[in-house]
């Protein structure tokens, strides 16, 4: 069983996201420890990028703050090395294809393998172009995690059949951010996914409250939350890890029902 599969093995998974380096890497490390200690099953780590096209204003702001603080891909790798001394849950990078290309794809993925990164999400990588990275990901044992947005049944089935790690189901078209209600027929998407793969699926984009998380976990195998955590960092700065830990605990309790 892959490390990512273990995140879903004990029941519904809660998956928080954080942008590395916002407001600084020391705070990111403390937040990762707080999330892991309070029940996060898997953590998505954003490597900051100057043009994060999938993100709404909250996570765009986090990217900008992290870059202004001097965060680089190498510094993020060092951060993961440090937290991996005692954080055993799966860690997945979420970044953009350009970050991987500019670093050198093989160098990037070999470093991921060395420091204990379990998966990679590239929101700007179309399914049709995933073979640019898939062979290297397989070579280094890093799951290339696909995203499924509301689309045709045939396309959902096609993406699901080749899924690795887990499937990231996008709750609605558009950018990340918190939403008051989610209108997409997610149950229909999950049904098609489950007919085509045993790989678990989690829903993200727009989830912020325990009620929303519980509802999404009722439909899929887990819930993903990013913007709500970034807002805590925006509000509390270096004091945010304690608040983030308490928030993750509430969300995990909701997901497990």
Segments and roles (model prediction):
Residues 47, 60-122, 255:
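Active-site beta->alpha loop and helix N-cap motifs at the rims of alpha/beta catalytic domains
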Residues 76, 191-199, 208-257:
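Alpha/beta catalytic cores of nucleotide-metabolism and tRNA/nucleoside-modifying enzymes
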Residues 1-7, 50-59, 71-81, 101-107, ...:
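Active-site-adjacent beta->alpha loops and helix N-cap segments on the catalytic face
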Residues 40-51, 117-121, 126, 171-177, ...:
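Glycine-rich phosphate-binding active-site loops on the catalytic face of alpha/beta enzymes
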Residues 14-18, 43-45, 91-95, 120-122, ...:
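Hydrophobic faces of well-ordered beta-strands that scaffold small-molecule active sites
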Residues 1-18, 80-85, 256:
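N-terminal amphipathic alpha-helix/helix-capping segment at the start of soluble metabolic enzymes
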Residues 25-35, 151-161, 203, 207-223:
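Catalytic cores of alpha/beta
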Residues 19-24, 94-102, 126-127, 147-151, ...:
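Glycine-rich beta-to-alpha transition loops that act as phosphate-gripper elements at the mouths
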């Amino acid at each position: 069983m892959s490390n990512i599969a273990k995140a879903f093995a004990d029941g519904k998974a809660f998956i928080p996201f954080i942008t590395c380096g916002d407001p600084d890497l020391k705070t990111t490390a403390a937040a990762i420890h707080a999330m892991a200690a309070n029940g996060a099953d898997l953590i998505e780590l954003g490597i900051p990028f100057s043009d994060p096209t999938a993100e709404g204003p909250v996570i765009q702001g986090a990217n900008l703050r992290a870059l202004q603080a001097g965060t680089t891909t190498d510094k993020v790798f060092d951060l993961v090395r440090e937290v991996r001394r005692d954080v055993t849950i799966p860690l997945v990078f979420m970044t953009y294809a350009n970050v991987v290309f500019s670093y050198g794809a093989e160098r990037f993925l070999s470093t991921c393998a060395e420091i204990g990164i379990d998966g990679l999400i590239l929101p700007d990588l179309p399914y049709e172009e995933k073979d640019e990275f898939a062979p290297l990901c397989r070579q280094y044992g890093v799951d290339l995690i696909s995203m499924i947005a509301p689309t045709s049944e045939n396309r959902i089935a096609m993406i699901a059949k080749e899924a690795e790690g887990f499937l990231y189901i996008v709750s609605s078209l558009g950018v990340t951010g918190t939403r008051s209600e989610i209108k997409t027929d997610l149950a229909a998407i999950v049904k098609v996914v489950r007919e085509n793969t045993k790989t678990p699926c989690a829903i993200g984009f727009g989830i912020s409250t325990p009620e929303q998380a519980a509802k999404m976990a009722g439909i899929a195998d887990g819930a993903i939350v990013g913007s709500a955590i970034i807002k805590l960092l925006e509000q509390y700065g270096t004091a945010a890890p304690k608040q983030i830990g308490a928030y993750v605990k509430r969300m995990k309790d909701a997901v497990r029902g």
